[in-house]
Protein backbone atom coordinates (compact mmCIF):
# COMPACT_ATOMS: atom_id res chain seq x y z
CA UNK A 1 0.00 0.00 0.00
CA UNK A 2 2.79 2.44 0.88
CA UNK A 3 4.53 1.74 -2.44
CA UNK A 4 1.30 2.42 -4.34
CA UNK A 5 0.75 5.63 -2.35
CA UNK A 6 4.29 6.75 -3.20
CA UNK A 7 3.74 5.98 -6.89
CA UNK A 8 0.44 7.85 -6.91
CA UNK A 9 2.03 10.81 -5.16
CA UNK A 10 4.85 10.87 -7.71
CA UNK A 11 2.33 10.81 -10.58
CA UNK A 12 0.28 13.60 -9.00
CA UNK A 13 3.36 15.72 -8.44
CA UNK A 14 4.46 15.21 -12.05
CA UNK A 15 0.99 16.20 -13.31
CA UNK A 16 0.97 19.25 -11.08
CA UNK A 17 4.42 20.35 -12.30
CA UNK A 18 3.42 19.90 -15.95
CA UNK A 19 0.21 21.91 -15.61
CA UNK A 20 0.89 24.55 -12.96
CA UNK A 21 0.13 28.08 -14.08
CA UNK A 22 -1.54 26.80 -17.28
CA UNK A 23 -5.14 27.36 -18.23
CA UNK A 24 -7.22 26.38 -21.21
CA UNK A 25 -8.22 29.34 -23.34
CA UNK A 26 -10.57 29.98 -26.21
CA UNK A 27 -10.44 33.29 -28.08
CA UNK A 28 -8.03 34.69 -25.49
CA UNK A 29 -10.41 33.96 -22.60
CA UNK A 30 -10.43 31.16 -20.02
CA UNK A 31 -12.36 28.27 -21.54
CA UNK A 32 -15.53 26.83 -20.05
CA UNK A 33 -14.52 23.22 -19.38
CA UNK A 34 -17.29 20.99 -18.00
CA UNK A 35 -16.64 17.37 -17.18
CA UNK A 36 -18.54 14.32 -16.05
CA UNK A 37 -17.58 11.03 -14.48
CA UNK A 38 -18.90 8.74 -17.20
CA UNK A 39 -20.81 9.18 -20.48
CA UNK A 40 -23.22 6.87 -22.26
CA UNK A 41 -20.51 6.19 -24.83
CA UNK A 42 -20.24 9.68 -26.28
CA UNK A 43 -20.13 13.22 -24.97
CA UNK A 44 -22.76 15.80 -25.79
CA UNK A 45 -22.55 18.75 -28.17
CA UNK A 46 -22.71 22.10 -26.33
CA UNK A 47 -24.84 23.72 -29.02
CA UNK A 48 -27.59 21.14 -28.47
CA UNK A 49 -27.35 21.16 -24.68
CA UNK A 50 -26.77 24.84 -23.98
CA UNK A 51 -28.43 26.26 -27.09
CA UNK A 52 -25.50 28.51 -27.96
CA UNK A 53 -22.55 28.68 -30.37
CA UNK A 54 -20.41 30.14 -27.58
CA UNK A 55 -18.53 26.85 -26.99
CA UNK A 56 -17.71 25.39 -30.43
CA UNK A 57 -14.88 23.34 -28.91
CA UNK A 58 -17.40 21.23 -26.95
CA UNK A 59 -18.37 18.75 -29.67
CA UNK A 60 -19.62 15.21 -29.24
CA UNK A 61 -16.80 12.64 -29.15
CA UNK A 62 -16.82 8.86 -28.79
CA UNK A 63 -16.07 7.43 -25.35
CA UNK A 64 -16.20 3.70 -26.04
CA UNK A 65 -14.52 2.80 -22.73
CA UNK A 66 -17.43 4.36 -20.83
CA UNK A 67 -19.87 1.74 -22.13
CA UNK A 68 -18.00 -1.02 -20.26
CA UNK A 69 -17.34 0.86 -17.03
CA UNK A 70 -18.46 -0.70 -13.76
CA UNK A 71 -21.25 1.84 -13.10
CA UNK A 72 -22.25 2.35 -16.73
CA UNK A 73 -25.85 1.25 -16.11
CA UNK A 74 -27.93 1.86 -13.01
CA UNK A 75 -31.63 1.71 -12.27
CA UNK A 76 -33.91 3.50 -9.86
CA UNK A 77 -37.59 3.07 -9.10
CA UNK A 78 -39.55 6.33 -8.85
CA UNK A 79 -43.12 7.11 -7.86
CA UNK A 80 -45.78 7.63 -10.50
CA UNK A 81 -46.42 6.56 -14.05
CA UNK A 82 -47.29 8.20 -17.33
CA UNK A 83 -43.82 9.65 -17.92
CA UNK A 84 -42.80 9.95 -21.54
CA UNK A 85 -39.43 10.98 -22.94
CA UNK A 86 -40.41 13.38 -25.71
CA UNK A 87 -37.05 14.83 -26.77
CA UNK A 88 -33.43 13.63 -26.80
CA UNK A 89 -30.24 15.13 -28.18
CA UNK A 90 -28.12 13.44 -30.86
CA UNK A 91 -26.04 11.64 -28.20
CA UNK A 92 -29.16 10.12 -26.62
CA UNK A 93 -29.41 12.31 -23.51
CA UNK A 94 -32.90 13.34 -22.44
CA UNK A 95 -33.90 16.93 -23.16
CA UNK A 96 -37.59 16.74 -22.27
CA UNK A 97 -39.99 14.55 -20.27
CA UNK A 98 -43.77 14.78 -20.32
CA UNK A 99 -46.25 13.53 -17.74
CA UNK A 100 -49.81 14.28 -18.76
CA UNK A 101 -49.86 17.94 -19.74
CA UNK A 102 -46.73 18.76 -17.70
CA UNK A 103 -43.46 19.10 -19.60
CA UNK A 104 -40.16 19.18 -17.72
CA UNK A 105 -36.57 19.68 -18.85
CA UNK A 106 -34.59 16.40 -18.92
CA UNK A 107 -31.89 17.66 -16.54
CA UNK A 108 -34.51 19.04 -14.15
CA UNK A 109 -36.18 15.61 -14.13
CA UNK A 110 -32.77 14.03 -13.47
CA UNK A 111 -32.12 16.35 -10.53
CA UNK A 112 -35.65 16.01 -9.15
CA UNK A 113 -35.33 12.23 -8.93
CA UNK A 114 -31.60 12.27 -8.07
CA UNK A 115 -30.69 10.19 -11.10
CA UNK A 116 -26.98 9.62 -11.75
CA UNK A 117 -27.17 10.55 -15.45
CA UNK A 118 -29.02 12.69 -17.98
CA UNK A 119 -29.14 9.68 -20.30
CA UNK A 120 -31.99 7.41 -19.33
CA UNK A 121 -34.88 5.25 -20.45
CA UNK A 122 -38.04 4.31 -18.55
CA UNK A 123 -40.04 1.17 -17.93
CA UNK A 124 -43.45 1.57 -16.31
CA UNK A 125 -45.64 -0.73 -14.25
CA UNK A 126 -49.05 -0.04 -12.70
CA UNK A 127 -47.80 2.27 -9.93
CA UNK A 128 -44.08 2.80 -10.40
CA UNK A 129 -41.59 3.75 -13.06
CA UNK A 130 -38.14 2.20 -13.31
CA UNK A 131 -35.57 4.60 -14.74
CA UNK A 132 -32.48 2.98 -16.28
CA UNK A 133 -29.57 5.39 -16.55
CA UNK A 134 -26.42 5.14 -18.61
CA UNK A 135 -23.33 7.04 -17.47
CA UNK A 136 -22.77 9.33 -14.50
CA UNK A 137 -23.29 13.07 -14.91
CA UNK A 138 -24.53 15.41 -17.62
CA UNK A 139 -22.32 14.03 -20.40
CA UNK A 140 -20.92 17.39 -21.50
CA UNK A 141 -17.20 18.01 -21.96
CA UNK A 142 -14.54 15.65 -20.66
CA UNK A 143 -15.35 12.14 -19.45
CA UNK A 144 -13.14 11.34 -16.46
CA UNK A 145 -13.37 7.61 -17.14
CA UNK A 146 -12.40 7.92 -20.81
CA UNK A 147 -9.60 10.35 -19.93
CA UNK A 148 -8.25 7.80 -17.47
CA UNK A 149 -8.35 5.09 -20.16
CA UNK A 150 -6.50 7.36 -22.61
CA UNK A 151 -3.87 8.04 -19.93
CA UNK A 152 -3.42 4.29 -19.42
CA UNK A 153 -2.73 4.06 -23.17
CA UNK A 154 0.11 6.53 -22.67
CA UNK A 155 -1.61 9.66 -24.00
CA UNK A 156 -0.29 12.93 -22.57
CA UNK A 157 -2.58 15.34 -20.76
CA UNK A 158 -2.39 17.62 -23.81
CA UNK A 159 -3.56 14.85 -26.16
CA UNK A 160 -6.36 13.95 -23.76
CA UNK A 161 -7.58 17.54 -23.55
CA UNK A 162 -7.33 17.94 -27.32
CA UNK A 163 -9.42 14.79 -27.75
CA UNK A 164 -12.29 16.18 -25.70
CA UNK A 165 -12.04 19.94 -26.09
CA UNK A 166 -10.11 20.86 -29.21
CA UNK A 167 -8.87 24.06 -27.61
CA UNK A 168 -5.41 25.53 -27.55
CA UNK A 169 -3.68 26.25 -24.27
What do the predicted segments below correspond to?
Residues 1-169:
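Conserved, single-site charged/polar hotspot
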